[in-house]
Amino acid sequence: MYSLNRLPRSAAFKSSANLLRRNASTTSAGGVNVVGFENKGPAATSSLTVAIKAGSRYETTPGVAHVLKSFAYKATASASALRTAREAELYGGVLSAALTREHLLLSAEFLRGDEEHFLNVLASVLSSSQFYRHELSELVLPVVEAETISSQAIPSTIALDLAHSLAFRRGLGNSLYANKNYPVSIDDVKSFGEAAFAKSNIAVIGTGVSTEALAKAVSNAFGAGTSSGSKLSTPKANYYGGETRVPLDIHAPATATPTMVIAFGTSSPASADLKVLKHLLGGETSVKWTPGASPLAQAADKIPGASAKAFLLPYSDAALFGVVLSAPTSAETKTLAQEVASIVKNAGEFKEEEVKRAVAKATFEDAASTETLSGFVAAAGPAALVGSVPEAQSFSGVSASSISKAAGELLKGKPTVVSIGNISVLPYADELGL
């Protein structure tokens, strides 16, 4: 096994914490926080994203955040949904909307120089969406229902959604998907949208455009159009934990396999130690067509068609850390779960050399994640909402002892266990020694 101490380290590795700050800058324009990220070389395209603090944790009615996301780019005071779509096509741009547990993200990607048009489109969505009743029934709800049904066909998606509900109950525990058993009215959407689209609740993130040019365009586009109400708020997240078991629907697609999630949570933001611990447990491979050398990868490799991967889902005031595992049959999933539980219970027992390798992986992942638009927005969104620029995580203080301490604190909490499959076969949490 090669030692990292013998390998030359690049300057980027040694100063990764400065990579983002080098080209990103922030300012305020007309009461809206603005973050611009200029490319080092000439770029033919630019992008704009409005980050709105209106994720599912802030919703006042179950599913209203999902419905509001699907109302994006419908009729506004200045254009119909058809006109908005056609003009985007004529400019060669792409409009999209995404929902996370903390943010609603409205994005536009386009040829450089067209930022004024697309910023006006985004501003009109926030300031003058009409929320017509016929659009809700004819255009929005069918899409919402289709997205919900699609998510229910993927056991891992169901398991992670249920895991959040068990771990955090309300707030972060709210589902990302609307449920037809809890109808959302047009008045619910209007009320939530009015609060969500307040200037104090949004930030604009631009890539391939200077902060100065972006700030000027934001001042012109947003002006006094958006409301200036107070921010949406939610109580601080608390971790609880729990267990639930769901039969795998006989109507599920053939690709659906028995799945389990074994997780633990924190009531504070994710630490550098947890980011490194995710790579220590692993499940992913660094070389294609090989099983991988991490404990989880080795465990899954014993069962053909099985997988076990560590995950870390960070939020502003909490985090969920765990393993999602699956196998072709419930009996095989039980066998894998027993080995995974043993690995998790010994998560703090790693050698210094193993920690160094995991730190290198975590540093690379942290830096590489911002190279894509979605990754940069995920990093810049929370920072922009508080008027700062995103910064890469520092892993300089991570060691085998700090990992052991972090893992010990994590495992003190009540586990969150979700089982999907043949529930007469899949193990209970106490049977796994958790």
Curated annotation (Swiss-Prot):
Q: Where in the cell is it found?
A: Mitochondrion inner membrane
Which is one GO molecular function term here? ubiquinol-cytochrome-c reductase activity
Q: Which InterPro entries match?
A: Metalloenz_LuxS/M16, MPP/UQCRC_Complex, Pept_M16_N, Peptidase_M16_C
Checking SUPFAM superfamilies in the record gives:
LuxS/MPP-like metallohydrolase
Pfam families according to UniProt: Peptidase_M16, Peptidase_M16_C
Q: Where is the transit peptide?
A: 1-31
Query: How does the entry describe its membrane topology?
Result: Peripheral membrane protein
Q: Which domain of life is it from?
A: Eukaryota
* GO BP annotations listed: mitochondrial electron transport, ubiquinol to cytochrome c
GO annotations of cellular component type: mitochondrial inner membrane; respiratory chain complex III
- Protein keywords: Electron transport, Membrane, Mitochondrion, Mitochondrion inner membrane, Respiratory chain, Transit peptide, Transport
The family classification in the record reads: Belongs to the peptidase M16 family. UQCRC2/QCR2 subfamily.
- Subunit structure as annotated in this protein's UniProt entry: Component of the ubiquinol-cytochrome c oxidoreductase (cytochrome b-c1 complex, complex III, CIII), a multisubunit enzyme composed of 10 subunits. The complex is composed of 3 respiratory subunits cytochrome b (COB), cytochrome c1 (CYT1) and Rieske protein (RIP1), 2 core protein subunits COR1 and QCR2, and 5 low-molecular weight protein subunits QCR6, QCR7, QCR8, QCR9 and QCR10.
Q: What function does the entry list?
A: Component of the ubiquinol-cytochrome c oxidoreductase, a multisubunit transmembrane complex that is part of the mitochondrial electron transport chain which drives oxidative phosphorylation.
| Record's protein name | Cytochrome b-c1 complex subunit 2, mitochondrial
